[in-house]
């Protein structure tokens, strides 16, 4: 299984967004820009899972916060995830988090912007996340936090 990055809106693999069960209304141009990309978990040519990643300076509380385009890579936010194969969503989160920590030393937090559903809660807690905060319409699950150095 390999992690694949979609960073060009002309990439034919962007077709996967039609299957987004969480935030299907978010346009492609918001999913892929200087501060956002789509990550896929693939086995050969087969797509096993997909997630959308947004880079921000602060942990978002709602979808509106995702519209901030920043050059900062302090906070990595997974704001939707879906899979086509059992266990692939969990594997994608693990591989994506490993890649973020390896390639982006400046990252302070790896979090989600998740719906307030039991399915999301079970998925993220089972995969090692902690509840960071509950917002009016969402929950942030935290997969990584770099403690401030004194």
Describe the residue ranges of each PLM region.
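C-terminal "cap" of GNAT-fold acetyltransferases
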Residues: 137-150
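Non-catalytic surface loops within mature trypsin-like serine protease
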Residues: 55-57, 116, 145-148
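Short amphipathic alpha-helix that is part of the acyltransferase structural core
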Residues: 1-30, 150
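Residue-level detector of beta-propeller blades
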Residues: 47, 130-133
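Short, small/polar residue-rich loop motifs at catalytic or cofactor-binding pockets
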Residues: 33-35
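A generic local structural motif
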Residues: 25-27, 63-66
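Conserved beta-strand in the GNAT
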Residues: 40, 45-57, 61, 77
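Acyl-donor binding region in acyl/amide transferases
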Residues: 64-128, 136
């Amino acid at each position: 299984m390999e992690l694949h990055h979609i960073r060009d809106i002309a990439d034919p693999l962007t077709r996967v967004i039609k299957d987004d069960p969480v935030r299907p209304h978010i346009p492609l141009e918001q999913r892929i820009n200087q501060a956002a990309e789509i990550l896929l978990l693939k086995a050969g040519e087969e797509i096993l899972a997909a997630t959308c990643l947004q880079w921000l300076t602060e942990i978002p509380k709602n979808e509106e916060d995702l519209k901030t385009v920043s050059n900062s890579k302090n906070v990595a936010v997974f704001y939707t995830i879906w899979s086509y194969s059992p266990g692939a969503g969990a594997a994608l989160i693990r591989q994506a988090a490993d890649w973020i920590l390896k390639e982006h030393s400046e990252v302070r937090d790896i979090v989600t912007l998740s719906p307030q559903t039991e399915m999301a809660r079970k998925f993220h807690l089972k995969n090692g996340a902690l509840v960071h905060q509950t917002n009016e319409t969402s929950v942030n699950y935290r997969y990584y936090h770099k403690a401030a150095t004194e």
